[in-house]
Amino acid sequence: MMTEAERASIAADGTDGLLGKRGKGVFHIHTLGCQMNVHDSERIAGVLEANGYVPATEDQINDNDLDLLVLNTCAVRENAAERMYGTIGRFNRVKLVRPNLQIAVGGCMAQLDRKKIADTAPWVSAVFGTKNIEDLPKLLDQNRATGKAQVQVTEQLRQFPSQLPAARASRISSWVAISVGCNNTCTFCIVPTTRGKEKDRRPGDILDEIRQCVADGAKEVTLLGQNVNSFGYGIGDRYAFSKLLRACGTIDGLERVRFTSPHPAAFTDDVIAAMAETPNIMHQLHFPLQSGSDRILRAMRRSYRSAKFLDILGRIRAAMPDAQISTDIIVGFPGETEEDFQQTMDVVRQARFSSAFTFIYSPRPGTPAAAMEQIPRDVVQDRFDRLVALQEQITEENLATFEGRDVEVMITGKLGKKDTDTHRVTGREKTGVLVHIGVPEGEPVPEIGDFVTATVTHAGRHNLLADPDVAAGQTYSVRH
């Protein structure tokens, strides 16, 4: 794995450095799906770099000047499979121009559909799963030697992906997986099939990784798991997750900690207290509802009901009045009636989520819900549109409450030309809301990773604007 210093040296050396020599090949990873896939893509990149491959520059990506394309796939929704095959088809068009290009497909769809991928797309060089990322370099070598597609997908996890080298996409924000897999049996979900049963990492290993991230320059980490708050249940410690959160609060230099995704059934008061009492745990929570109908929740095998869900939200907000809580909602689950849908709308009105990821139900082969009677598409679309309209209204009303308030924003991402021309920087405030900040005239532009405290002057539909008038007493300050 290359260090930041080595990357900088390569960039400075140009054609005389490793990029000029191309190593074993120049690669690019295209990632579909969730945050866990983003985490895994960083591990795929780390494994490739450790084996002599070189990450592509932006110009090389734009020019298709590549020796290896890796697709890390998602299997959560039906259109994810369609996107995968569409992307593989686009990769083939690149291969027609660059015959020596290798194409590798990994992730959840590879775990699920390995043979079909190889049969449908004979131009694919290697297929690997979620549990054997470390095998990719060997599969690529075998493909080069034999000219035949290499398919290797294992069912048992040999080691946590987090134990593999990582080439992190961000210098200041890091993903840290605390577990893999899921022990729940939701009737709509394919994740237990593709990721397996839940396995937890040792708390000491997790904390060591976080400390290393901070030593490497990270100011923020996001703890990842399919059900983070059931962490430790397998060894009989139901307080393990809240202990982990509190331990994060003892790490010097770690400014912000987030986590995703918890399961409402296991969201207990000790976790709420840890969030409220640990200064660097952000008051941001993604809390999947899925449906507000108890009948549908039962059919989904979600082990909570709407009253319990709302009760937990009430306890969270009592402890953290500033908490921003987002959710997932599925519309059109098999058997959903208009009455069921209205119950979901009622819960959304009461919960007042900061935002919602709303999905039209899509059957996943092999899940119990796929065999149930489906609802006509036009009915589902109408319900979906009504739910989105309601949530958009709530989101706008919520963002409007930020106007006139001072927020601390961590500057993230690259500054584009538009931002430079308008003298703006972008980042997220503590509860995760996106904020665009106008830098006052005469002030230097903050660097990525700086913290800017500024007065919010306008609330948009999905973000905030801070154009502070310092002369009028509004706030603008920078902390490095």
UniProtKB/Swiss-Prot annotation:
Its EC number is 2.8.4.3. Residues 168-397 form the Radical SAM core domain. The keyword Chaperone does not apply. It comes from the Bacteria. One of its GO terms (molecular function) is 4 iron, 4 sulfur cluster binding. GO terms for cellular component: cytosol. Disulfide bonds: none annotated. InterPro entries: Elp3/MiaA/NifB-like_rSAM (IPR006638), Methylthiotransferase (IPR005839), Methylthiotransferase_CS (IPR020612), Methylthiotransferase_N (IPR013848), Methylthiotransferase_N_sf (IPR038135), MiaB_methiolase (IPR006463), rSAM (IPR007197), rSAM_horseshoe (IPR023404). Its cofactor is [4Fe-4S] cluster. [4Fe-4S] cluster 1 binds at C34, C74, C108. Residues 400-470 form the TRAM domain. It is found in: Cytoplasm. Residues 25-145 form the MTTase N-terminal domain. [4Fe-4S] cluster 2 binds at C182, C186, C189. Monomer. Belongs to the methylthiotransferase family. MiaB subfamily. Catalyzes the methylthiolation of N6-(dimethylallyl)adenosine (i(6)A), leading to the formation of 2-methylthio-N6-(dimethylallyl)adenosine (ms(2)i(6)A) at position 37 in tRNAs that read codons beginning with uridine. HAMAP family: tRNA_metthiotr_MiaB. This is tRNA-2-methylthio-N(6)-dimethylallyladenosine synthase.
